[in-house]
């Protein structure tokens, strides 16, 4: 029962939809003479469609009434083809509207293009041949006949350069070109160079130089090839030799860069009398190579005095209320005859002693064999050279980076067990 009811409802909905469509079509294409026939037709039309779809479910009175108006009223069939005819009439109109401008445009295009060349050359034979199909080739012939004269103007340049025995036209061209070489573009210069057989690569200045030079075209490339063949290997080998020399220098300098620890260890041996026993153990660990020059007794005494002066300078610089300064300098032997105070105006800034990224250079000055209290990175080649040069000048040794490294001024006392307090103090702002 549910299937039958659903099928009946679907048929009723279809019939209503078809009736509505027929009413709309009737209102669009309604005529005064056929108004009566249309009023009766939309009510009776859906019944035969329903019967045609499902004759079993169609109503009994609807089936006989459906075909009767079609038989007795032939006028009912007339309004149906009329809207079709009207639709067909509209479609060709639209197609004609779309088709009409195309031939017009083609005709105008064909009318305007040919008369321009016809008026120029050979008007009579082309006018006779215009109604025929092959008017195209004479037009192309006319265009080619027009084009060769401008093409022939640059062509005389090509035969003249190969004609080397005729030097008369060449100087005139050279004079004209030298007058306007700078005005010529790069492409024109290259064309001229190609005509002369010269190389075309290079900047505009090089091209101008080649154009101005009066050497014959065949001798130049040979000379250049010889020069390149003779001179090419030398610049190629020179940088290699230079690189080898630089590498040898770097190998020679590398041991010197790693050799500073041993002389500093020797210095710790010299200063062991006035220092704690900790650096002595460190000196025993670091082997001293034979080629390292041992400092004499006089420089050792001067180094001791300078170290004491430096410690006095540090003591005077830290007269501010800080912590544990006396404890740091307890082990230091005070000199019997102290020298005048060292001026505190160091060339470098005091920030180098603070734990800033610039202090890496100062930390590298301390001997790498000694255990530094702070985890200092690898000795960096760059450092506060002004400050260190000033200290090296005081010690009488050579400046940094020249010859073998001299023993550093800094004594091993700064790396003793109580040296951590000094680093803690250096963290305070100056």
From Swiss-Prot:
Gene Ontology cellular-component terms listed: nucleus
Alphabetical keyword list: Activator, Nucleus, Transcription, Transcription regulation
Biased composition (Basic and acidic residues): 87-103, 207-228
Matches recorded under Gene3D superfamilies: SAP domain (1.10.720.30)
Subcellular localization(s) per the UniProt record: Nucleus
Residue stretches of biased makeup (Low complexity): 363-373, 393-403
The keyword Nucleus belongs to this UniProt entry's keyword annotation: yes
Listed Pro residues bias regions: 147-170
Major subcellular location class: nucleus
Subunit comment: Interacts with MEF2C.
Pfam family, one: SAP
GO biological process terms held by the UniProt record: regulation of transcription by RNA polymerase II
Protein name from the UniProt record: MEF2-activating motif and SAP domain-containing transcriptional regulator
Domain SAP: 181-215
Span list, region Transcription activation: 224-430
PANTHER family found in the cross-reference section: LYSINE-RICH CEACAM1 CO-ISOLATED PROTEIN LYRIC PROTEIN (PTHR23251), MEF2-ACTIVATING MOTIF AND SAP DOMAIN-CONTAINING TRANSCRIPTIONAL REGULATOR (PTHR23251:SF1)
Molecular-function annotations in GO: transcription coregulator activity
Lineage of the species this protein comes from: Eukaryota, Metazoa, Chordata, Craniata, Vertebrata
Gene: MAMSTR
Free-text function comment from the UniProt entry: Transcriptional coactivator. Stimulates the transcriptional activity of MEF2C. Stimulates MYOD1 activity in part via MEF2, resulting in an enhancement of skeletal muscle differentiation.
Residues spanned by motif MEF2-binding: 12-28
Region annotated Disordered, chain positions: 84-172, 204-239, 280-301, 330-416
């Amino acid at each position: 029962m549910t299937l039958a009811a659903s099928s009946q409802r679907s048929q009723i909905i279809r019939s209503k939809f078809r009736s509505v469509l027929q009413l709309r079509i009737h209102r669009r294409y309604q005529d005064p003479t056929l108004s009566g026939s249309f009023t009766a037709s939309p009510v009776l039309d859906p019944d035969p469609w329903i019967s045609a779809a499902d004759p079993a479910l169609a109503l009994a009175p609807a089936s006989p009434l459906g075909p009767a108006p079609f038989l007795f009223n032939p006028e009912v069939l007339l309004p149906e083809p009329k809207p079709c005819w009207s639709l067909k009439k509209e479609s060709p109109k639209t197609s004609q509207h779309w088709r009409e401008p195309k031939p017009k445009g083609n005709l105008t295009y064909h009318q305007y293009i040919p008369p321009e060349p016809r008026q120029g050359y050979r008007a009579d034979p082309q006018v006779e041949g215009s109604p025929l199909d092959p008017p195209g080739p004479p037009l192309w012939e006319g265009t080619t006949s027009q084009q060769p004269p401008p093409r022939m103007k640059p062509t005389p340049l090509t035969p003249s350069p190969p004609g080397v025995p005729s030097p008369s036209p060449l100087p005139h061209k050279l004079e004209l070109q030298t007058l306007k070489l700078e005005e010529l573009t790069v492409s024109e210069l290259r064309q001229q160079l190609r005509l002369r057989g010269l190389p075309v690569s290079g900047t505009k200045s090089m091209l101008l130089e080649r154009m101005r030079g009066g050497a014959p075209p065949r001798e130049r490339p040979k000379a250049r090839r010889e020069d390149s063949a003779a001179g090419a290997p030398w610049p190629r080998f020179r940088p290699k030799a230079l690189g080898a020399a630089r590498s040898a220098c770097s190998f020679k300098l590398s041991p010197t860069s790693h050799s500073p620890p041993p002389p500093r260890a020797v210095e710790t041996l010299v200063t062991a009398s006035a220092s704690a026993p900790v650096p002595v153990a460190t000196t025993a660990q670091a082997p001293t190579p034979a080629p390292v020059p041992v400092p004499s007794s006089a420089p050792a005494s001067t180094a001791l005095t300078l170290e004491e002066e430096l410690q006095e300078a540090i003591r005077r610089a830290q007269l501010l209320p800080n912590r544990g300064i006396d404890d740091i300098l307890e082990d230091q032997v005070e000199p019997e005859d102290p020298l005048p105070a060292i001026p505190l105006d160091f060339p470098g800034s005091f920030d180098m002693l603070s734990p800033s990224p610039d202090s890496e250079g100062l930390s590298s000055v301390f001997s790498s064999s000694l255990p530094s209290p702070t985890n200092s990175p690898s000795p960096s080649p760059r450092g506060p050279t002004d400050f260190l040069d000033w200290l090296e000048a005081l010690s009488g040794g050579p400046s940094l980076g020249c010859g073998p490294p001299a023993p550093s001024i800094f004594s091993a006392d700064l790396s003793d067990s109580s040296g951590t307090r000094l680093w803690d103090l250096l963290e305070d702002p100056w």
